[in-house]
Curated annotation (Swiss-Prot):
Its main location: cytoplasm. Its cofactor is [4Fe-4S] cluster. [4Fe-4S] cluster 2 binds at C173, C177, C180. NCBIfam families: miaB-methiolase (TIGR01574), MiaB/RimO family radical SAM methylthiotransferase (TIGR00089). Residues 159-396 form the Radical SAM core domain. The gene is miaB. This is tRNA-2-methylthio-N(6)-dimethylallyladenosine synthase. InterPro entries: Elp3/MiaA/NifB-like_rSAM (IPR006638), Methylthiotransferase (IPR005839), Methylthiotransferase_CS (IPR020612), Methylthiotransferase_N (IPR013848), Methylthiotransferase_N_sf (IPR038135), MiaB_methiolase (IPR006463), rSAM (IPR007197), rSAM_horseshoe (IPR023404). It comes from Synechococcus sp. (strain CC9902).
């Protein structure tokens, strides 16, 4: 069976595009929330008659959905903008848009820095893209960064996958971590109603989607802003209740959620994840530091001991669960002993994956003004050491998969080998496997396949599908 028999699943909104229409190009920087916002904005553009360009330099409208979580991400945006500003000077008909967190942070000052811009819009205005572009078409330069109630999303997003989809459930962040710019650029928490979330998931299931990731900046804070108290005296709307509410959506085989905050990760939530069969055994729970004094300086609102209890409870209920996290090294005042405690915690927890970052001072955050900043050389050295530890631990965690059979959701064709499919296990391991089983059965993207793991690497697995065992 040749690879040409494999189906390349195209999201419905990408099919049959008329190349004679005005075209757009979106470049997304940063987190999953930005990726979900970009999908919605692409859907708005296509509902306006735009089609996706084949290349950025061919597009009639270029939109950068930006990230300001660290300085290097922000500087990359300005590099891209410089190139497009020259295009705009050569082609006044080009529409140039900056969306997302850099737009929210800089506002009108972006127009002074890049006068060629047509539209500057913060993340709370993503669903207003059509209205804002209409103002641009009337000859205005538009800045939309005021605090705004996020309208319920009634657009059809242009999904980047036809199998796995994002669904936003809560926008914004009410935390005040001393290093983080997110609350000032994404605004206060705004939770969507559970009925609207379920309706969106039902629509995705009808299109053939198999896996949904529920998204929020602090997703386990979901529902704090929604009214309602139960007879037991607890909030009526929590992430736990939401998982129960959407778990039986027909056609959806897997549920994930991200990103969690240790402050709100409850035993009740853990028990629901263990009891609900569609919830995958993978949890992304940032810890940021292994030192309590630093966690207090960061205003994280929990201790290392609480974090340990959460992980212990997860592994008690779901022994094979994978845990990923975020960590910052080089935070102001971090001593060598405090840094070593972070290394020790990484070893102790045996994380499956850790996203590491050197502390980067951000505008309008308390930590950026402190006098005890660490030299860049110290940050770089600590980051290098911690990355080596993370990679070693990830490989050691993956070794236990050798020879096991894992359920893998085939998400697409391996771009490096057209005879292979690629997908993820329930524990979020990227896995490559032959599209053809030993008995000649050809699996397709969207199939749930039992795969025997033959080889492991630090951040991926590869294996062989068992004979004729596509689960769906």
């Amino acid at each position: 069976m040749t690879a040409t028999s494999l189906k390349t699943l195209t999201p419905p909104s990408k099919q049959g595009l008329d190349q004679n229409r005005r075209s757009y190009w979106i470049t997304t920087f940063g987190c999953q929330m930005n990726k979900a916002d970009s999908e919605r904005m692409a859907g708005i553009l296509e509902s306006m008659g735009y089609c996706e360009a084949t290349a950025e330099l061919d597009a009639d409208l270029v939109l950068y959905n930006t990230c300001t979580i660290r300085d290097n991400a922000e500087q990359k945006v300005y590099s891209y903008l410089g190139r497009q500003a020259q295009r705009k000077r050569d082609n006044p008909n080009l529409t140039l848009v900056v969306a997302g967190c850099v737009a929210q942070q800089e506002g009108e000052s972006l127009l002074r820095r890049v006068p060629e811009l047509d539209l500057v819009m913060g993340p709370q205005h993503a669903n207003r893209l059509e209205t804002l572009l209409q103002q641009v078409d009337s000859g205005q330069q538009v800045v939309a960064t005021e605090e705004h109630h996020i309208l319920e999303d009634i657009t059809t997003a242009r999904r980047d996958s036809a199998i796995c989809g994002w669904v936003n459930v809560i926008y914004g962040c009410n935390e005040r971590c001393t290093y983080c710019v997110v609350p000032s650029v994404r605004g206060q928490e705004q939770s969507r109603r559970p009925e609207a979330i379920r309706l969106e998931m039902e629509g995705l299931a009808a299109q053939g989607f198999k896996e949904i990731t529920l998204l929020g900046q602090n997703i386990d804070a979901y529902g704090r802003d929604l009214p309602g108290i139960t007879a037991e005296g607890r909030r009526e709307h929590t992430l736990t209740d939401l998982l129960h509410h959407v778990h039986d959506v027909e056609g959806i085989e897997r549920l994930r959620f991200a990103t969690s905050h240790p402050r709100y990760f409850t035993e009740r939530l853990i028990d629901a994840c263990a009891d609900l069969s569609k919830v995958c055994e993978h949890f992304h729970i940032p810890f940021q530091s292994g030192d309590n004094a630093l966690l207090k300086s960061m205003a994280r609102g929990y201790t290392v001991e609480r974090y340990r209890r959460i992980i212990d409870r997860i592994r008690d209920r779901m022994p094979d669960a994978s845990i990923s996290a975020d960590v910052i090294v080089g935070f102001p005042g971090e001593t060598d002993a405090q840094y070593r405690r972070t290394l020790d915690l990484i070893d102790e927890i045996a994380f499956d994956q850790v996203n590491t970052a050197a502390y980067s001072p951000r505008p309008n955050t308390p930590a950026a003004t402190w006098d005890n900043q660490l030299p860049e050389s110290v940050k770089v050295e600590r980051l290098k050491e911690i990355n080596a530890l993370v990679e070693r631990n990830a490989r050691e965690r993956n070794i236990r998969y050798q020879g096991r059979t894992e359920e893998v959701l085939a998400e697409g064709i391996n771009p490096k080998d057209p005879e292979q499919l690629m997908g993820r296990t329930r524990t979020n391991r990227l896995t490559f496997f032959s599209a053809t089983s030993p008995d000649g059965h050809l699996y397709q993207p969207g199939d749930l396949v039992n795969v025997r793991i033959d080889a492991v690497r630090s951040f991926s697995l590869s294996g062989t599908p068992l004979p004729s065992n596509a689960l769906h």
